[in-house]
Amino acid sequence: MSKFLLQSHSANACLLTLLLTLASNLDISLANFEHSCNGYMRPHPRGLCGEDLHVIISNLCSSLGGNRRFLAKYMVKRDTENVNDKLRGILLNKKEAFSYLTKREASGSITCECCFNQCRIFELAQYCRLPDHFFSRISRTGRSNSGHAQLEDNFS
């Protein structure tokens, strides 16, 4: 009987070791999908920035049947003529002026995900306003499907 308990204890220890190893690897693989940025980063060599990012998002969203979340109708051109008159009396040397500036954190933004890092197609699609049925749990083929898999199906 004690031999059986010893084997059972050994098997449980091996199983626990295996589960802990798998759990630690899962944590590492999930962390690869999280992007973080700071103000000192340079754009990724294969990142999408500026006008290129805008064009890709526009084309992707329209091909998926959705709209961009950041709509141009909410953008307003600012009137800067009167600003110059108010600031005319304030003069700073370059060093003093730059001392008031700090680098912006771009964490969690489309710029962080796609310009400073290399983003994937499903990360780009998160910035589209997609139809409700797009991320349904059951696809047209009847199999269980996540939004990522359905997105890949749409481009296949």
Swiss-Prot record:
Localization annotation: Secreted
Keywords: Cleavage on pair of basic residues, Disulfide bond, Gamma-carboxyglutamic acid, Neuropeptide, Secreted, Signal
Pfam families to which the protein is assigned, alphabetical: Insulin
Modified residues (4-carboxyglutamate): E152
This protein's record includes keyword Disulfide bond: yes
Prodomain positions: 79-93, 96-102, 141-156, 144-156
Tissue: Expressed in the central region of the cerebral ganglia mostly within the F and C clusters.
Main location: secreted
GO CC terms: extracellular region
Membrane spanning residue stretches: none
Disulfide bonds: C37-C114, C49-C119, C61-C128, C112-C115
Signal sequence annotation: 1-31
GO molecular function, one term: hormone activity
Domain of life: Eukaryota
InterPro entries to which the protein is assigned, alphabetical: Insulin-like, Insulin-like_sf
CDD domains: IlGF_insulin_bombyxin_like
SUPFAM superfamilies: Insulin-like
Gene Ontology biological-process entries: neuropeptide signaling pathway
Assembly description: Heterodimer of a B chain or a B chain' and an A chain probably linked by three disulfide bonds.
Record function comment: Involved in glucose metabolism.
Annotated family: Belongs to the insulin family.
Stated name of the protein: Insulin
Species: Aplysia californica
